[in-house]
C-alpha cells in the first residue's frame, strides 16, 4: 500500500511539474512573439532616374501631395483609432547608396514594437544587422538584411 501511495505521489508530482513548466514556456513564447511584432509598413522607398520628375508625375496624375521626400500617407490604427500612423512613399535617385549593401532598387520600411529587444532577438537568430539603432524625434531605426539580400529598414515610431 505504501508503494502504491508513493507511486501515485511521484506521478502526481511529475504531472504538476510538467504542467508548471509548460505554463512557463508558453508565457515566455508569448513574450517572444510580442517582441517580434511588425505592426505595418512604414515606408516604401525606390530608386528612379529623376525623383523630382517622379514626384511631379504622381502629384499631377494621382493627386499625391509631394515634397522633396515624396509623400506621407496618414491613417488611423485599427486597434486604437485615436492613434495616427503614417506610411512614407519616397523616390530616391538611382545613384543613392542608401539601399546598400543590397543591390535592389527598393527598400521596405516596417513599423515595429520594441526595437531594441527585436534587434537582440534577430542577432540571436543569426540575422545580419547592418548598423546600430539610431534615434530621432520621430522614432528609432535600424537596418537588416533578409534571406535574399534585401536591405530592410525597421522603425519604431516615437510615442505620441
Identify the meaning behind each predicted range:
Residues 1-29:
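Bacterial Sec-dependent N-terminal signal peptides
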Residues 77, 93, 156-158:
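Residue-level signal for short segments within beta-strands and strand-turn junctions
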Residues 30-32, 93-96:
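A generic local structural motif
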Residues 20-49, 68-70, 96-160:
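Vicinal oxygen chelate
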Residues 35-39, 45-90, 124, 142:
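Core segments of cupin and vicinal oxygen chelate
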Amino acid at each position: 500500500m505504501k508503494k502504491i501511495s508513493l507511486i501515485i505521489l511521484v506521478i502526481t508530482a511529475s504531472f504538476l511539474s510538467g504542467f508548471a513548466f509548460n505554463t512557463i514556456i508558453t508565457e515566455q513564447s508569448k513574450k517572444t512573439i510580442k517582441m517580434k511584432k511588425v505592426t505595418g509598413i512604414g515606408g516604401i522607398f525606390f530608386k528612379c532616374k529623376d525623383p523630382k520628375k517622379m514626384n511631379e508625375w504622381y502629384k499631377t496624375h494621382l493627386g499625391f501631395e509631394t515634397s522633396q521626400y515624396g509623400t506621407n500617407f496618414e491613417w488611423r490604427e485599427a486597434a486604437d483609432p485615436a492613434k495616427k500612423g503614417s506610411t512614407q512613399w519616397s523616390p530616391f535617385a538611382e545613384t543613392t547608396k542608401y539601399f546598400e549593401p543590397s543591390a535592389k532598387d527598393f527598400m521596405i520600411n516596417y513599423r515595429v514594437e520594441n526595437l531594441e529587444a527585436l534587434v537582440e532577438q534577430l542577432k540571436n537568430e543569426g540575422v545580419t544587422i547592418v548598423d546600430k539603432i539610431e534615434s530621432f524625434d520621430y522614432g528609432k531605426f535600424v537596418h537588416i538584411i533578409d534571406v535574399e539580400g534585401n536591405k530592410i529598414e525597421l522603425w519604431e515610431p516615437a510615442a505620441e
